[in-house]
């Protein structure tokens, strides 16, 4: 199962790189969000996709699940949510100001307005 998940992570990484390299600001935001989800999936996969009990000491339980990847992913989800919200607000504001979401046409707009 871990091998299959690694291939899925590779495909998702390729998709996110394709979106990040596009010219639309919304596609770039979707690509970065997809990349963070891919990193979370990779961490879960490397933590082990095995069945086990909660890591609380009880007699008779020999197989525990590692809690560190789960804690890292929970933190990463919160951080990626806040970064995505910031990027969406930034994209909305730049669209309202500049009238486009094309990154290449945004390049010299502010410099041309100053002259």
Swiss-Prot record:
UniProt keyword Transferase present: no
Family: Belongs to the CPA3 antiporters (TC 2.A.63) subunit C family.
Organism per entry: Staphylococcus saprophyticus subsp. saprophyticus (strain ATCC 15305 / DSM 20229 / NCIMB 8711 / NCTC 7292 / S-41)
Protein name: Na(+)/H(+) antiporter subunit C1
InterPro entries xrefs: CPA3_antiporter_subunitC, NUOK/Mnh_C1-like
Pfam family, one: Oxidored_q2
UniProt cross-references to NCBIfam families, sorted A to Z: PRK08600.1 (NF006372), PRK09094.1 (NF006573)
Subcellular location, record wording: Cell membrane
Gene3D superfamilies: 1.10.287.3510
Purpose: Mnh complex is a Na(+)/H(+) antiporter involved in Na(+) excretion.
Keyword entries, A-Z: Antiport, Cell membrane, Hydrogen ion transport, Ion transport, Membrane, Sodium, Sodium transport, Transmembrane, Transmembrane helix, Transport
Transmembrane domains' residue ranges: 1-21, 28-48, 72-92
Biological process annotations from GO: proton transmembrane transport; sodium ion transport
Entry GO terms, CC: plasma membrane
Subunit composition and interactions: May form a heterooligomeric complex that consists of seven subunits: mnhA1, mnhB1, mnhC1, mnhD1, mnhE1, mnhF1 and mnhG1.
A GO term for molecular function: antiporter activity
Superkingdom of origin: Bacteria
Protein's UniProt keywords contain Transferase: no
Topological category with respect to the lipid bilayer: Multi-pass membrane protein
